[in-house]
């Protein structure tokens, strides 16, 4: 692999304000460097101290890190705790039961405040209801829910009894849900009749019924349904149960099930480059520690904060920075059911103003779409709202381009709020490389420096460090507590995917390209080095999309690549060969529309290709390998400069280039 060229030449620097630095948990670069030095000096002592200070343990651990079966690392292995106890009970016991845990705003603007006392009651009742249905420690429960208090309650209730939850994003199709139900071996499914998004009721229970009817998930004995809209749904009296009915008669008291620190808290599926989604397994102790610790460091969390992460609980960001991180610290947070553009594109800014949000965390995709809306209509421009309560703003899901960064800084942050541009992954459990708001000088487009204890580096294809200024492969050199433990049911795939022998078998392979600044050492993320696309912060495997396209009766062959997109960061571009003659004009447009809808049904709307181009064939080597790098160039509209001498059919490039 030749060195990755860095094209970002960003020299603007934004210093933390004295006001922010003065009250920060990590105040100034000297404090940051002291923590980094502590971790380097005594790695296990550093991580042991954080775990003792941050979490409540029923049985204290005596050993911090077990590397005897690397890369299957164990942290705090002989310790026992419960994630739900840490998230709820301990705050009630400390006299903070009447503190608001969740300010929930529904799609239609209805607001519900949930205190820690309320949350304890609701989680305990639902946990007891799960136990009544025979669900026990170690069982897997799939949660297919809208953004709701009930979704958070379901996750916390599983944690309370030691069941392992697997949340599936409510935008996924019945086929995607079925794959996950089968792979994880679920014994129960928690869902909703419908979900509300942008004023529209969208089905969930009926999609869940389709998924269950596909077979392979006969172990699912209970389907528990939250009544959100009262819409018409199918019903199976032998299997289906209303959430409100089964919890009504349950006790408010449910003792937490103490579990070992390595007990699987959850399994969350993420797209892989080989087609089948990967069930990323996370622990209880190490994961919970980092979700809470990064709240303290990255967001400089204070008890007086009103925190708002706009992610969905179906993604890891919603796990770490809605369900677990804020609650573990006893914080108050906003949870939002709807979308940023309904009833208008000022919804986020209105909510920040109304709820007096102090820390705001969203995706670059949302920012880019709201920039367009604000430029078109001054009424929904952030400067038309009072955002003065904000003190820290953040981004997650994908790198943010410098232009959007500066707009966000000036118009949402009022040129005074630090931006924490966070790099991390489903597999890392929490933030890895990010500025600290009271310490790190900010550079637009750079996630800056690793958090203390995170040994990130940029290496070449043999695992050797590359010099600053030269692009390479992003890796992490030492294990950390919140890291992925395995791929559910496939430990060999875990080793090959994340600790490849080509890099020596000991480096965690992030799968992203990166470059470090020659002077500051700051990291800039340069995108995926494999065939996983990042669309609006959602990781989508190209193989999954290709498989969905080829499953259509019209399609003989398909290849999917990404291309840059101003709104979604990356757009899906599909090159398709039909089983009949290559269509043109209106016929091509109609078939393309049908294929988009097909992919939406097979996988979910987020996977729909933005571009579909038809060809008589695909560019292939003589051995039959599709030349994806050439397709990437075509998708971007670039001139083909690569060597095409190995191509069996070079003329196809002209045809695919013209078929836009």
Swiss-Prot record:
EC number(s) on file:
6.2.1.1
- Provide the residue positions that the database annotates as binding CoA: 197-200, 317, 536
Chain positions recorded as ATP binding sites: 397-399, 421-426, 512, 528, 539
- InterPro entries under this entry? Ac_CoA_lig (IPR011904), ACAS_N (IPR032387), AMP-bd_C (IPR025110), AMP-bd_C_sf (IPR045851), AMP-binding_CS (IPR020845), AMP-dep_synth/lig_dom (IPR000873), ANL_N_sf (IPR042099)
Where on the tree of life does the source sit, at the highest rank?
Bacteria
Please name the PROSITE patterns in this protein's record: AMP_BINDING
Q: What cofactors are annotated for this protein? A: Mg(2+)
N6-acetyllysine sites (modified residues): 625
Q: Which GO terms describe its cellular component?
A: cytosol
Q: Name one GO biological process term.
A: acetyl-CoA biosynthetic process from acetate
Residues bound to Mg(2+) are 550, 555
Give the matching NCBIfam families: Ac_CoA_lig_AcsA, PRK00174.1
The protein depicted here goes by the name Acetyl-coenzyme A synthetase
